[in-house]
Protein backbone atom coordinates (compact mmCIF):
# COMPACT_ATOMS: atom_id res chain seq x y z
CA UNK A 1 0.00 0.00 0.00
CA UNK A 2 1.35 3.43 -0.91
CA UNK A 3 1.74 6.20 1.65
CA UNK A 4 -0.94 8.22 -0.11
CA UNK A 5 -3.40 5.32 0.01
CA UNK A 6 -2.65 4.71 3.68
CA UNK A 7 -3.23 8.38 4.46
CA UNK A 8 -6.55 8.37 2.62
CA UNK A 9 -7.77 5.31 4.52
CA UNK A 10 -6.68 6.82 7.83
CA UNK A 11 -8.70 9.99 7.17
CA UNK A 12 -11.71 7.94 6.05
CA UNK A 13 -11.70 5.87 9.23
CA UNK A 14 -11.09 8.86 11.49
CA UNK A 15 -14.02 10.77 9.99
CA UNK A 16 -16.45 7.84 10.11
CA UNK A 17 -19.69 8.93 11.83
CA UNK A 18 -19.97 7.84 15.46
CA UNK A 19 -23.67 7.06 15.33
CA UNK A 20 -23.23 5.08 12.13
CA UNK A 21 -20.67 2.92 13.95
CA UNK A 22 -22.89 2.54 17.02
CA UNK A 23 -25.96 1.47 15.09
CA UNK A 24 -24.09 -0.53 12.48
CA UNK A 25 -22.10 -2.51 15.03
CA UNK A 26 -22.82 -6.23 14.89
CA UNK A 27 -21.01 -9.37 15.95
CA UNK A 28 -19.74 -10.71 12.63
CA UNK A 29 -18.02 -13.97 13.44
CA UNK A 30 -17.34 -15.68 10.12
CA UNK A 31 -13.99 -14.81 8.60
CA UNK A 32 -11.84 -15.80 5.67
CA UNK A 33 -10.66 -19.38 6.10
CA UNK A 34 -13.35 -20.25 8.69
CA UNK A 35 -15.68 -23.24 8.68
CA UNK A 36 -18.98 -24.10 10.35
CA UNK A 37 -18.97 -27.89 10.21
CA UNK A 38 -22.56 -28.66 11.18
CA UNK A 39 -26.06 -27.27 11.40
CA UNK A 40 -28.22 -25.26 9.00
CA UNK A 41 -25.46 -22.66 8.51
CA UNK A 42 -22.85 -25.27 7.60
CA UNK A 43 -20.28 -23.59 5.38
CA UNK A 44 -16.58 -23.71 4.53
CA UNK A 45 -14.83 -20.58 3.32
CA UNK A 46 -13.38 -20.85 -0.17
CA UNK A 47 -10.68 -18.32 0.72
CA UNK A 48 -7.47 -18.55 2.68
CA UNK A 49 -7.18 -16.71 5.97
CA UNK A 50 -5.78 -13.18 5.64
CA UNK A 51 -4.11 -11.69 8.74
CA UNK A 52 -4.62 -8.06 9.65
CA UNK A 53 -1.65 -5.94 8.62
CA UNK A 54 0.29 -3.63 10.91
CA UNK A 55 -1.64 -0.54 9.84
CA UNK A 56 -4.99 -2.16 10.61
CA UNK A 57 -3.83 -3.31 14.04
CA UNK A 58 -2.37 0.12 14.80
CA UNK A 59 -5.73 1.79 14.16
CA UNK A 60 -7.54 -0.72 16.36
CA UNK A 61 -5.06 -0.18 19.19
CA UNK A 62 -5.35 3.61 18.79
CA UNK A 63 -9.11 3.31 19.16
CA UNK A 64 -8.85 1.01 22.15
CA UNK A 65 -6.18 2.61 24.29
CA UNK A 66 -4.79 5.70 22.57
CA UNK A 67 -3.48 8.76 24.43
CA UNK A 68 -6.03 11.51 23.77
CA UNK A 69 -4.67 14.51 25.68
CA UNK A 70 -4.39 16.19 29.07
CA UNK A 71 -7.25 15.46 31.50
CA UNK A 72 -9.32 18.49 32.47
CA UNK A 73 -9.26 18.00 36.26
CA UNK A 74 -12.29 20.27 36.34
CA UNK A 75 -13.28 20.09 40.01
CA UNK A 76 -13.28 22.76 42.69
CA UNK A 77 -9.49 22.57 42.86
CA UNK A 78 -6.75 20.63 41.09
CA UNK A 79 -6.52 17.16 42.64
CA UNK A 80 -3.57 16.27 44.81
CA UNK A 81 -2.75 13.15 42.84
CA UNK A 82 -3.59 12.94 39.17
CA UNK A 83 -2.56 11.36 35.91
CA UNK A 84 -0.92 13.36 33.13
CA UNK A 85 -2.51 11.50 30.25
CA UNK A 86 -6.08 11.07 29.08
CA UNK A 87 -6.96 7.97 27.09
CA UNK A 88 -9.64 6.93 24.66
CA UNK A 89 -11.21 4.98 27.54
CA UNK A 90 -12.40 6.45 30.82
CA UNK A 91 -10.92 5.55 34.17
CA UNK A 92 -11.43 6.10 37.88
CA UNK A 93 -9.23 6.40 40.96
CA UNK A 94 -6.11 7.38 38.99
CA UNK A 95 -6.47 4.10 37.11
CA UNK A 96 -5.48 3.40 33.51
CA UNK A 97 -3.68 0.28 34.68
CA UNK A 98 -5.03 -2.02 32.00
CA UNK A 99 -2.46 -3.56 29.66
CA UNK A 100 -3.67 -4.60 26.22
CA UNK A 101 -2.30 -8.00 25.22
CA UNK A 102 -2.97 -9.41 21.78
CA UNK A 103 -2.00 -12.33 19.62
CA UNK A 104 -1.88 -12.95 15.90
CA UNK A 105 -0.12 -15.35 13.55
CA UNK A 106 3.21 -13.63 14.22
CA UNK A 107 3.26 -13.78 18.00
CA UNK A 108 2.04 -12.49 21.37
CA UNK A 109 2.33 -8.77 22.10
CA UNK A 110 1.46 -6.20 24.74
CA UNK A 111 0.65 -2.51 24.48
CA UNK A 112 1.09 -0.55 27.70
CA UNK A 113 2.04 3.11 27.23
CA UNK A 114 2.00 3.68 30.99
CA UNK A 115 4.95 6.08 30.81
CA UNK A 116 3.32 8.42 28.29
CA UNK A 117 2.44 11.97 29.31
CA UNK A 118 0.17 13.94 27.03
CA UNK A 119 1.79 17.04 25.58
CA UNK A 120 -1.33 19.17 25.07
CA UNK A 121 -5.04 19.34 25.70
CA UNK A 122 -5.95 17.48 22.50
CA UNK A 123 -3.08 15.21 21.54
CA UNK A 124 -4.25 14.69 17.95
CA UNK A 125 -5.92 17.77 16.47
CA UNK A 126 -4.88 18.01 12.83
CA UNK A 127 -5.09 15.60 9.94
CA UNK A 128 -1.30 15.43 9.83
CA UNK A 129 -1.12 14.49 13.53
CA UNK A 130 -3.33 11.49 12.85
CA UNK A 131 -0.33 9.91 11.14
CA UNK A 132 1.29 9.47 14.56
CA UNK A 133 -0.86 6.47 15.46
CA UNK A 134 1.33 4.03 13.54
CA UNK A 135 4.55 5.39 15.06
CA UNK A 136 3.05 5.26 18.57
CA UNK A 137 1.88 1.71 17.97
CA UNK A 138 5.37 0.64 16.95
CA UNK A 139 6.89 2.50 19.90
CA UNK A 140 4.71 0.87 22.56
CA UNK A 141 4.21 -2.58 21.06
CA UNK A 142 6.34 -5.20 22.78
CA UNK A 143 6.61 -8.74 21.49
CA UNK A 144 6.57 -11.38 24.21
CA UNK A 145 6.84 -14.55 22.14
CA UNK A 146 6.73 -15.91 18.60
CA UNK A 147 3.68 -17.59 17.16
CA UNK A 148 0.01 -17.42 18.08
CA UNK A 149 -0.92 -17.86 21.74
CA UNK A 150 -1.73 -21.54 22.27
CA UNK A 151 -5.21 -21.49 23.78
CA UNK A 152 -6.37 -25.13 23.88
CA UNK A 153 -9.31 -25.63 21.52
CA UNK A 154 -11.42 -27.52 24.05
CA UNK A 155 -13.85 -27.00 26.93
CA UNK A 156 -12.39 -25.56 29.12
CA UNK A 157 -10.80 -23.03 28.65
CA UNK A 158 -13.04 -22.05 25.73
CA UNK A 159 -16.80 -22.29 25.93
CA UNK A 160 -18.15 -24.73 23.38
CA UNK A 161 -19.94 -22.25 21.14
CA UNK A 162 -16.72 -20.27 20.59
CA UNK A 163 -14.38 -23.11 19.66
CA UNK A 164 -15.10 -22.98 15.92
CA UNK A 165 -13.86 -19.42 15.39
CA UNK A 166 -12.01 -18.02 18.42
CA UNK A 167 -8.27 -17.37 17.93
CA UNK A 168 -8.25 -18.90 14.45
CA UNK A 169 -5.40 -18.34 11.96
CA UNK A 170 -5.60 -14.86 10.46
CA UNK A 171 -7.36 -13.33 13.46
CA UNK A 172 -6.07 -10.77 15.93
CA UNK A 173 -7.29 -11.52 19.45
CA UNK A 174 -7.15 -8.61 21.93
CA UNK A 175 -6.98 -9.45 25.65
CA UNK A 176 -7.01 -6.46 28.06
CA UNK A 177 -5.75 -7.35 31.55
CA UNK A 178 -6.41 -4.98 34.46
CA UNK A 179 -4.47 -4.64 37.72
CA UNK A 180 -6.79 -4.37 40.73
CA UNK A 181 -3.91 -4.07 43.23
CA UNK A 182 -2.99 -0.61 41.98
CA UNK A 183 -6.59 0.58 42.08
CA UNK A 184 -7.12 -0.78 45.58
CA UNK A 185 -4.09 1.11 46.92
CA UNK A 186 -5.29 4.31 45.26
CA UNK A 187 -8.81 3.80 46.61
CA UNK A 188 -7.59 3.20 50.17
CA UNK A 189 -5.49 6.38 50.02
CA UNK A 190 -8.46 8.41 48.83
CA UNK A 191 -10.79 6.97 51.47
CA UNK A 192 -8.58 7.37 54.54
CA UNK A 193 -6.78 10.65 53.78
CA UNK A 194 -9.04 13.70 53.82
CA UNK A 195 -6.27 16.04 52.70
CA UNK A 196 -5.05 14.11 49.66
CA UNK A 197 -8.18 12.14 48.89
CA UNK A 198 -11.15 13.16 46.78
CA UNK A 199 -13.74 11.01 48.54
CA UNK A 200 -13.44 12.65 51.97
CA UNK A 201 -12.61 16.34 52.38
CA UNK A 202 -10.52 18.30 54.84
CA UNK A 203 -8.53 16.96 57.79
CA UNK A 204 -10.02 13.86 59.33
CA UNK A 205 -13.17 12.02 58.51
CA UNK A 206 -11.52 9.09 56.77
CA UNK A 207 -13.23 5.73 56.37
CA UNK A 208 -12.82 3.15 59.15
CA UNK A 209 -11.96 -0.03 57.26
CA UNK A 210 -12.91 -3.19 59.14
CA UNK A 211 -12.41 -6.86 58.32
CA UNK A 212 -15.90 -8.33 58.08
CA UNK A 213 -14.43 -11.82 57.62
CA UNK A 214 -12.53 -11.57 60.93
CA UNK A 215 -15.25 -10.44 63.31
CA UNK A 216 -15.30 -6.79 62.26
CA UNK A 217 -11.91 -5.90 63.71
CA UNK A 218 -10.03 -2.86 62.42
CA UNK A 219 -8.13 -3.64 59.22
CA UNK A 220 -5.12 -1.48 60.06
CA UNK A 221 -6.94 1.78 60.83
CA UNK A 222 -7.04 1.51 64.65
CA UNK A 223 -4.01 3.77 65.43
CA UNK A 224 -5.59 6.74 63.62
CA UNK A 225 -8.98 6.73 65.34
CA UNK A 226 -7.81 8.84 68.27
CA UNK A 227 -6.23 11.51 66.06
CA UNK A 228 -9.41 11.98 64.06
CA UNK A 229 -7.85 11.00 60.73
CA UNK A 230 -10.26 8.05 60.75
CA UNK A 231 -13.91 8.46 61.75
CA UNK A 232 -15.12 5.47 63.77
CA UNK A 233 -18.67 6.00 62.51
CA UNK A 234 -17.73 5.75 58.83
CA UNK A 235 -17.43 1.98 58.72
CA UNK A 236 -16.34 0.34 55.47
CA UNK A 237 -16.10 -3.49 55.36
CA UNK A 238 -13.01 -4.78 53.61
CA UNK A 239 -15.00 -7.07 51.32
CA UNK A 240 -17.04 -4.12 50.06
CA UNK A 241 -13.88 -2.02 49.63
CA UNK A 242 -12.29 -4.68 47.43
CA UNK A 243 -15.50 -5.11 45.47
CA UNK A 244 -15.52 -1.35 44.90
CA UNK A 245 -11.97 -1.51 43.54
CA UNK A 246 -13.20 -4.09 41.03
CA UNK A 247 -16.13 -1.86 40.05
CA UNK A 248 -13.68 0.97 39.42
CA UNK A 249 -11.44 -1.18 37.23
CA UNK A 250 -13.74 -3.47 35.32
CA UNK A 251 -15.09 -0.73 33.07
CA UNK A 252 -11.64 -0.22 31.51
CA UNK A 253 -11.23 -3.52 29.62
CA UNK A 254 -14.88 -3.49 28.52
CA UNK A 255 -14.60 0.02 27.08
CA UNK A 256 -11.26 -0.78 25.41
CA UNK A 257 -12.86 -3.77 23.67
CA UNK A 258 -15.93 -1.78 22.68
CA UNK A 259 -13.79 1.02 21.24
CA UNK A 260 -11.97 -1.56 19.12
CA UNK A 261 -15.33 -3.04 18.14
CA UNK A 262 -16.56 0.34 16.89
CA UNK A 263 -13.32 0.80 14.96
CA UNK A 264 -13.88 -2.49 13.14
CA UNK A 265 -17.17 -1.07 11.89
CA UNK A 266 -15.46 2.05 10.56
CA UNK A 267 -12.74 -0.03 8.90
CA UNK A 268 -14.95 -2.78 7.49
CA UNK A 269 -13.53 -5.63 9.57
CA UNK A 270 -15.37 -8.46 11.25
CA UNK A 271 -15.15 -9.53 14.85
CA UNK A 272 -16.89 -9.63 18.18
CA UNK A 273 -16.22 -9.25 21.89
CA UNK A 274 -17.02 -12.03 24.31
CA UNK A 275 -16.18 -13.55 27.66
CA UNK A 276 -16.71 -17.18 26.68
CA UNK A 277 -13.53 -18.54 28.25
CA UNK A 278 -11.95 -19.36 31.60
CA UNK A 279 -9.53 -16.52 32.22
CA UNK A 280 -7.38 -18.51 34.67
CA UNK A 281 -6.27 -20.89 31.92
CA UNK A 282 -5.69 -18.12 29.37
CA UNK A 283 -3.59 -16.12 31.84
CA UNK A 284 -1.49 -19.19 32.52
CA UNK A 285 -0.91 -19.51 28.78
CA UNK A 286 0.12 -15.84 28.65
CA UNK A 287 2.75 -16.52 31.31
CA UNK A 288 1.21 -14.97 34.43
CA UNK A 289 2.81 -15.92 37.71
CA UNK A 290 0.33 -17.74 39.96
CA UNK A 291 0.85 -17.33 43.71
CA UNK A 292 -0.84 -19.42 46.39
CA UNK A 293 -2.74 -17.87 49.28
CA UNK A 294 -2.48 -18.40 53.02
CA UNK A 295 -5.89 -20.03 52.79
CA UNK A 296 -5.06 -23.13 50.75
CA UNK A 297 -8.72 -23.55 49.82
CA UNK A 298 -8.42 -20.46 47.66
CA UNK A 299 -7.30 -20.62 44.05
CA UNK A 300 -3.85 -19.40 43.07
CA UNK A 301 -3.74 -15.69 42.38
CA UNK A 302 -2.39 -14.26 39.07
CA UNK A 303 -0.08 -11.46 40.21
CA UNK A 304 1.67 -10.52 36.97
CA UNK A 305 4.14 -11.35 34.24
CA UNK A 306 7.74 -10.72 35.26
CA UNK A 307 9.06 -7.56 33.65
CA UNK A 308 5.84 -6.96 31.71
CA UNK A 309 2.89 -6.33 34.02
CA UNK A 310 3.66 -6.66 37.71
CA UNK A 311 1.15 -6.29 40.53
CA UNK A 312 1.69 -3.78 43.33
CA UNK A 313 2.24 -6.49 45.91
CA UNK A 314 4.74 -9.23 46.79
CA UNK A 315 6.54 -11.01 45.18
CA UNK A 316 7.16 -7.98 42.94
CA UNK A 317 7.85 -5.78 45.98
CA UNK A 318 9.58 -6.81 49.22
CA UNK A 319 6.69 -5.46 51.28
CA UNK A 320 3.34 -3.73 50.93
CA UNK A 321 4.98 -0.53 52.18
CA UNK A 322 7.28 -0.59 49.15
CA UNK A 323 4.33 -1.41 46.89
CA UNK A 324 2.39 1.61 48.19
CA UNK A 325 5.39 3.90 47.62
CA UNK A 326 5.70 2.64 44.04
CA UNK A 327 1.97 3.05 43.42
CA UNK A 328 2.13 6.64 44.64
CA UNK A 329 4.91 7.39 42.16
CA UNK A 330 2.75 6.01 39.37
CA UNK A 331 -0.35 7.86 40.58
CA UNK A 332 1.58 11.12 40.58
CA UNK A 333 3.10 10.57 37.13
CA UNK A 334 2.61 13.67 35.03
CA UNK A 335 2.05 16.11 37.91
CA UNK A 336 5.20 18.04 37.04
CA UNK A 337 4.22 18.54 33.41
CA UNK A 338 4.30 22.16 32.30
CA UNK A 339 1.24 21.58 30.12
CA UNK A 340 -1.99 22.32 31.96
CA UNK A 341 -5.62 22.48 30.80
CA UNK A 342 -6.30 25.78 32.57
CA UNK A 343 -6.04 29.32 31.27
CA UNK A 344 -4.73 30.56 34.62
CA UNK A 345 -1.00 30.18 35.24
CA UNK A 346 0.04 27.39 37.64
CA UNK A 347 1.21 29.99 40.16
CA UNK A 348 -2.40 31.03 40.74
CA UNK A 349 -3.69 27.58 41.67
CA UNK A 350 -0.59 25.96 43.13
CA UNK A 351 -1.50 26.87 46.71
CA UNK A 352 -4.91 25.24 46.28
CA UNK A 353 -3.35 21.86 45.54
CA UNK A 354 -3.06 19.88 48.79
CA UNK A 355 0.05 18.01 49.76
CA UNK A 356 -0.18 14.51 48.40
CA UNK A 357 -0.61 12.58 50.56
CA UNK A 358 -0.48 13.64 54.21
CA UNK A 359 2.06 11.80 56.35
CA UNK A 360 -0.71 10.28 58.45
CA UNK A 361 -2.74 9.33 55.38
CA UNK A 362 0.22 7.57 53.79
CA UNK A 363 1.03 5.72 57.01
CA UNK A 364 -2.58 4.61 57.41
CA UNK A 365 -2.75 3.45 53.79
CA UNK A 366 0.37 1.34 54.29
CA UNK A 367 -1.05 -0.12 57.50
CA UNK A 368 -4.27 -1.20 55.79
CA UNK A 369 -2.35 -2.76 52.90
CA UNK A 370 0.00 -4.56 55.30
CA UNK A 371 -2.97 -5.89 57.24
CA UNK A 372 -4.53 -7.35 54.10
CA UNK A 373 -1.36 -9.09 52.95
CA UNK A 374 -0.29 -10.32 56.39
CA UNK A 375 -3.75 -11.65 57.21
CA UNK A 376 -4.61 -13.30 53.91
CA UNK A 377 -1.22 -13.94 52.29
CA UNK A 378 -2.28 -12.06 49.17
CA UNK A 379 -3.28 -8.60 47.99
CA UNK A 380 -6.16 -8.02 47.47
CA UNK A 381 -7.63 -10.49 49.96
CA UNK A 382 -10.84 -11.62 48.28
CA UNK A 383 -10.35 -10.91 44.57
CA UNK A 384 -7.53 -11.64 42.14
CA UNK A 385 -4.71 -9.17 41.60
CA UNK A 386 -5.05 -9.35 37.80
CA UNK A 387 -8.23 -9.86 35.79
CA UNK A 388 -8.91 -10.89 32.21
CA UNK A 389 -12.63 -10.71 31.44
CA UNK A 390 -13.03 -9.88 27.76
CA UNK A 391 -11.74 -10.99 24.38
CA UNK A 392 -12.14 -8.75 21.35
CA UNK A 393 -11.37 -10.55 18.11
CA UNK A 394 -10.90 -8.80 14.77
CA UNK A 395 -10.64 -10.56 11.42
CA UNK A 396 -11.34 -10.20 7.73
CA UNK A 397 -14.90 -11.18 6.88
CA UNK A 398 -15.87 -13.71 4.26
CA UNK A 399 -18.64 -11.83 2.38
CA UNK A 400 -19.65 -14.99 0.50
CA UNK A 401 -20.98 -16.51 3.71
CA UNK A 402 -23.13 -13.49 4.47
CA UNK A 403 -24.42 -13.27 0.90
CA UNK A 404 -25.54 -16.88 1.09
CA UNK A 405 -27.35 -16.81 4.42
CA UNK A 406 -28.28 -13.21 5.26
CA UNK A 407 -30.18 -10.23 3.90
CA UNK A 408 -28.18 -7.50 2.21
CA UNK A 409 -28.05 -5.29 5.32
CA UNK A 410 -25.96 -7.82 7.23
CA UNK A 411 -22.82 -6.15 5.87
CA UNK A 412 -22.33 -2.42 5.74
CA UNK A 413 -20.65 -0.36 3.02
CA UNK A 414 -17.27 -0.46 4.76
CA UNK A 415 -17.32 -4.26 4.82
CA UNK A 416 -18.27 -4.51 1.17
CA UNK A 417 -15.44 -2.17 0.17
CA UNK A 418 -12.75 -3.34 2.58
CA UNK A 419 -10.80 -5.80 0.46
CA UNK A 420 -10.61 -3.52 -2.57
CA UNK A 421 -9.72 -0.44 -0.51
CA UNK A 422 -7.28 -1.99 1.96
CA UNK A 423 -5.92 -5.04 0.14
CA UNK A 424 -6.30 -4.31 -3.55
CA UNK A 425 -3.58 -6.74 -4.55
CA UNK A 426 -5.38 -9.60 -2.77
CA UNK A 427 -8.82 -8.60 -4.07
CA UNK A 428 -7.57 -8.77 -7.66
CA UNK A 429 -6.43 -12.38 -7.36
Residue ranges and their predicted role:
Residues 1-429:
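Acidic, surface-exposed loops and disordered segments
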Amino acid sequence: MTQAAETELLQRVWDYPLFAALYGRRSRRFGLGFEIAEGPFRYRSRHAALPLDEFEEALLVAAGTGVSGIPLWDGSRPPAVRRGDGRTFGSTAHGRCTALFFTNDRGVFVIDPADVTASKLNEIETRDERQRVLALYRQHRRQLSDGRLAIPRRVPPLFGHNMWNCNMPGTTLFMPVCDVSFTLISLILNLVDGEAGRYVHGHGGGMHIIDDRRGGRAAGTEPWLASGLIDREKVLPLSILERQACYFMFSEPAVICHNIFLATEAMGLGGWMHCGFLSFKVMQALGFRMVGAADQAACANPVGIDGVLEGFCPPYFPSMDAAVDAALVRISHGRASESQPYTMPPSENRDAIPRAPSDAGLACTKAVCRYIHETYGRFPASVDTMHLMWFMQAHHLDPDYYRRFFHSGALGPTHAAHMAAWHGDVAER
